[in-house]
Amino acid sequence: VVSCADITALAARQGLFTSDQDLYTDSRMGQLNVLTGTQGEIR
């Protein structure tokens, strides 16, 4: 029996979910940029 986690891990390893991960990362970075604004830089 193959679990959903195994399928997800395999797909992620093959790069099928890289675009989703990039979108998530970009959205997080966008939120951080909005929060910091001109007061500081993310280093």
UniProtKB/Swiss-Prot annotation:
Keyword set, alphabetical order: Calcium, Heme, Hydrogen peroxide, Iron, Metal-binding, Oxidoreductase, Peroxidase
UniProt KW Lipid metabolism keyword: no
Catalytic activity, as annotated: 2 a phenolic donor + H2O2 = 2 a phenolic radical donor + 2 H2O
Superkingdom of the organism of origin: Eukaryota
EC number: 1.11.1.7
Calcium is among the record's keywords: yes
Binding note for cofactor: Binds 2 calcium ions per subunit. Binds 1 heme b (iron(II)-protoporphyrin IX) group per subunit.
Cofactor: Ca(2+); heme b
GO terms for biological process, alphabetical: hydrogen peroxide catabolic process
Gene Ontology molecular function: lactoperoxidase activity; metal ion binding
Protein family (similarity comment): Belongs to the peroxidase family. Classical plant (class III) peroxidase subfamily.
Miscellaneous information on this protein: On the 2D-gel the determined pI of this protein is: 9.3, its MW is: 38249 kDa.
Function recorded in the entry: Removal of H(2)O(2), oxidation of toxic reductants, biosynthesis and degradation of lignin, suberization, auxin catabolism, response to environmental stresses such as wounding, pathogen attack and oxidative stress. These functions might be dependent on each isozyme/isoform in each plant tissue.
Protein name as annotated: Peroxidase
